[in-house]
């Protein structure tokens, strides 16, 4: 953890935090990227699991994982604008992926924007298809396998 993040707690979210985390995700994805708010939350029927970065009692970052069509997806990765550039997103991603892979998950799928693609490639992720455009920005399909992830961690 970096010196600037010592007051930030990274953890698995509790159910009572879901609404606040979804609001954060909607603010980022809808407010900044123009994605319709109704398309942002993961459907409850997919039983999403959430992780968060909190400062005090305020959520400043969120990410989710869910099972869809037999595959584990990781996404809705968001950090409040004023906390970007402090490695909070990177630490949240690492925390959530370590936790997810410790749950006997072998493979994670995601559709990612360029910055997240670079992060996932650094951790053993592989691009598995061509980018497509979603609400004006490129989304690239990426796969991250547990063994590759742990190997990249050293």
Say what each PLM segment does.
Residues 111, 126-145:
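Conserved catalytic-core motifs of GNAT/GCN5-like acyltransferases
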Residues 120-121, 125:
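Conserved active-site tyrosine of GNAT-family acetyltransferases
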């Amino acid at each position: 953890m970096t010196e600037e993040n010592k007051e930030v707690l990274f953890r698995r979210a509790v159910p009572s935090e879901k609404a606040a985390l979804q609001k954060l995700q909607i603010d980022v994805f809808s407010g900044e990227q123009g994605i319709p708010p109704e398309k942002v939350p993961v459907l409850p029927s997919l039983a999403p699991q959430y992780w968060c970065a909190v400062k005090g009692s305020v959520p400043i970052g969120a990410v989710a994982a869910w099972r869809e069509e037999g595959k584990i997806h990781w996404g809705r990765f968001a950090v409040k604008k004023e906390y970007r550039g402090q490695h909070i997103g990177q630490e949240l991603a690492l925390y959530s992926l370590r936790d997810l892979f410790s749950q006997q998950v072998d493979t994670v799928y995601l559709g990612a924007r360029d910055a997240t693609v670079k992060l996932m490639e650094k951790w053993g992720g592989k691009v598995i298809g061509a980018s497509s455009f979603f609400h004006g920005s490129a989304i690239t399909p990426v796969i991250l396998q547990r063994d590759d992830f742990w190997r990249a961690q050293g």
